[in-house]
């Protein structure tokens, strides 16, 4: 019952943040329809690794991450929630990047990340009390992103991931071939209002 109540509060919190939450700092270098080339500043994430299917991974990791930003840290400090929540397969073994298609929907390890506010540097980020939560600094980087609505199903993600891959190929953009998935809304958001993204790190 306690777990259900906490999850309910967390989802209410996310609902409020979906509209007002601070987004991680970046500049749009180029926009072409629903595709953008972005330059991201250095940022800090709190991440949890879970064993699950892609669709289950965020739910399994959310509680630990939400408790961390709610004060379950050494400093007992509450941290503002930002957008998006990102998701990345661990098996791809690359640093967690900014904005939670995968060809396989089977179980595997996934990293789910919350981004710290833009003014919170790595050295002042509170230390987690939960060993499952890890703090990581992400260097400044250039990313290609495609934005889309509707539900974050494997098919919908795969469709837009392929569109972004084709765009980068057509425009001779070198990239690291491992995606990051980014989600901005709580589950009950109407499908036509949802914001999802697939991102790839650009090689410079």
Model-identified regions with their sequence ranges:
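Repetitive helical segments and hydrophobic/amphipathic motifs
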Residues: 11-12
């Amino acid at each position: 019952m306690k777990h259900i109540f906490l999850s309910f509060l967390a989802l209410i919190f996310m609902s409020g943040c979906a509209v007002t939450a601070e987004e991680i700092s970046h500049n749009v270098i180029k926009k072409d329809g629903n595709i953008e080339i972005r330059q991201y500043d250095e940022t800090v994430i709190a991440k949890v690794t879970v064993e699950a299917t892609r669709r289950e991974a965020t739910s399994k990791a959310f509680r630990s991450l939400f408790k961390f930003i709610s004060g379950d840290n050494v400093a007992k400090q509450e941290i503002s929630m930002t957008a998006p929540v990102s998701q990345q397969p661990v098996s791809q073994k690359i640093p967690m990047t900014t904005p939670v298609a995968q060809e396989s929907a089977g179980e595997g390890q996934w990293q789910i990340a919350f981004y710290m506010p833009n003014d919170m540097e790595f050295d002042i980020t509170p230390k987690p009390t939960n060993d499952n939560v890890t703090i990581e600094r992400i260097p400044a980087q250039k990313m290609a992103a495609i934005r889309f609505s509707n539900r974050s199903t494997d098919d919908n993600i795969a469709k837009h991931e392929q569109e972004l891959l084709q765009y980068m190929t057509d425009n001779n953009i070198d990239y690291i071939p491992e995606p990051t998935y980014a989600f901005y809304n709580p589950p009950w958001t109407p499908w036509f209002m949802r914001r999802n993204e697939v991102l790839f790190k650009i090689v410079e």
